[in-house]
């Protein structure tokens, strides 16, 4: 083991069993929100050999979308690429079991009529929506990349997206949907200086030779292609160690290889371990769940702080009590990278951003079917889709506030 400071992050493709589950849960959410934007949704999915189980709690007026959940499930599996038993899973023929009930009225009471309205007599309409649960959520941004994400997770996601791209466009038509990437970067302080290791494991058709075909073609069409496009100022990518399918074979994959569950890739979904995580998963949850909406808001806050030049990197924590609208806590950490007093940064955040759940939903326009595309390749720093929490619309307000 080298004495170098090495940090590692991983990503997975949309065909990974856990990501199939995230995709199904978010596809169900989007279908319900499209017909009834006020739908309350908490949907969990399990996949295993030949079976999909979708469970949870839903309150909605979207009767047609609710009745069509089975078809929504099948369509998403087929879109991912599991369309034949040769791939270990087939969206057309797999069993789909639905076990969904209504949202608890006790929870609904706290969301629909917050403590501020119910007990304290608040008149502001935004005080009427309480947090759907207690919890703590983190947001992070760093000037490592143009998208203000830590480099290791940003690079791992690019590799995963490229792996899926060359499978779907037929460049490497022997690839199958399941896959993982991992990137290890050497740091000098907090500056990424050298790409040390790339690990890429991909499901493939039987009979594909690793040394003569798979490894060199993955290097050419995925790894080299991504590194050529990267163009990072401080990172030396000239001689990384590359490990392709280091077990030697990856034919059996997807739900036949491993069971999958919604919400089991929360580090992949966020900052690759570079920043802290409050523990709550995202997929399958409507925005009344602060696990999701407040984590998005914290990314929005952090990204605007860095883009405003107030710090080179920032981590923001918010916390809620179930049934309360106002956060119970806000914490800002700039790691000594700030250009102004951190106390002023925290005060500016409080002035510029309204972190009550109803305000987050309003300001980010979250009652829309925008969630299925986030189920793979990360919820933050996306360069391939537009997401409201990635917008830099508060930079001038923050500058003025400090």
Curated annotation (Swiss-Prot):
Annotated K(+) binding lies at 44
Binding-site positions, Mg(2+): 18
Give the gene name.
metK
Taxonomic lineage from the root = Bacteria, Bacillati, Actinomycetota, Actinomycetes, Mycobacteriales
Chain positions covered by the region annotation Flexible loop: 103-113
Q: Which InterPro entries does this UniProt record tie to the protein? A: ADOMET_SYNTHASE_CS (IPR022631), S-AdoMet_synt_C (IPR022630), S-AdoMet_synt_central (IPR022629), S-AdoMet_synt_N (IPR022628), S-AdoMet_synthetase (IPR002133), S-AdoMet_synthetase_sfam (IPR022636)
Principal localization reads: cytoplasm
- Cofactor(s) needed: Mg(2+); K(+)
List the CDD domains hit by this protein, alphabetically: S-AdoMet_synt (cd18079)
UniProt-recorded name of the protein: S-adenosylmethionine synthase
Q: What is its EC number?
A: 2.5.1.6
Summary of subunit composition and partner proteins: Homotetramer; dimer of dimers.
Give TM regions.
none
Q: Identify the SUPFAM superfamilies for this entry.
A: S-adenosylmethionine synthetase (SSF55973)
* Gene Ontology BP annotations: one-carbon metabolic process; S-adenosylmethionine biosynthetic process
Q: Name one GO cellular component term.
A: cytoplasm
Q: What does this protein do?
A: Catalyzes the formation of S-adenosylmethionine (AdoMet) from methionine and ATP. The overall synthetic reaction is composed of two sequential steps, AdoMet formation and the subsequent tripolyphosphate hydrolysis which occurs prior to release of AdoMet from the enzyme.
Q: What are the binding positions for L-methionine in this chain? A: 57, 103, 258, 289
């Amino acid at each position: 083991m080298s004495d170098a400071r090495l940090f590692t992050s991983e990503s997975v493709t949309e065909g990974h069993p856990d990501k199939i589950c995230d995709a199904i849960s978010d596809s169900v959410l989007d279908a319900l929100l499209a017909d009834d934007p006020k739908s309350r949704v908490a949907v969990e999915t399990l996949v295993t050999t030949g079976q999909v189980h979708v469970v949870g709690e839903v309150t909605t007026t979207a009767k047609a979308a609710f009745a069509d959940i089975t078809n929504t499930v099948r369509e998403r599996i087929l879109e991912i690429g599991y369309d034949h038993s040769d791939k270990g899973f087939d969206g057309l023929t797999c069993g789909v079991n639905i076990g969904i009930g209504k949202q608890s009225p006790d929870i609904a009471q706290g969301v629909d009529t917050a403590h501020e309205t119910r007990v304290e007599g608040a008149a502001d309409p935004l005080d009427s929506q309480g947090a759907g649960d207690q919890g703590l959520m983190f947001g992070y941004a760093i000037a490592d990349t143009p998208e203000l994400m830590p480099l290791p997770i940003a690079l791992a996601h690019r590799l995963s997206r490229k792996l899926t791209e060359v499978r779907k466009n037929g460049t490497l038509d022997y690839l199958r949907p399941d896959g993982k990437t991992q990137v290890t970067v050497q740091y000098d302080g907090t500056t990424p200086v050298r790409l040390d290791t790339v690990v890429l494991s991909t499901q493939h058709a039987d009979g594909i030779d690793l040394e003569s075909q798979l490894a060199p073609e993955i290097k050419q069409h995925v790894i080299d292609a991504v590194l050529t496009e990267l163009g990072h100022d401080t990172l030396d990518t000239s001689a990384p160690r590359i490990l392709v399918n280091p077990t030697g074979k990856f034919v059996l994959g997807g739900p036949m290889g491993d069971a999958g569950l919604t919400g089991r890739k929360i580090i992949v979904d966020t900052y690759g371990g570079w920043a802290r995580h409050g523990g709550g998963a995202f997929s399958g949850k409507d925005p009344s769940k602060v696990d999701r909406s407040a984590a998005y808001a914290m990314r929005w806050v952090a990204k605007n702080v860095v883009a405003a030049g107030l710090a080179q990197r920032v981590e923001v924590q918010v916390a809620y009590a179930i049934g309360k609208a106002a956060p119970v806590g806000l914490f800002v950490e700039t790691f000594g990278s700030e250009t102004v007093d951190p106390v002023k940064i925290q005060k500016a955040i409080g002035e510029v951003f309204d972190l009550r759940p109803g305000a987050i939903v309003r300001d980010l326009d979250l009652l829309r079917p925008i969630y299925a595309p986030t189920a793979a390749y990360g919820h933050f720093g996306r360069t391939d889709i537009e997401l409201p929490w990635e917008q830099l619309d508060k930079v001038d307000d923050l500058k003025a506030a400090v």
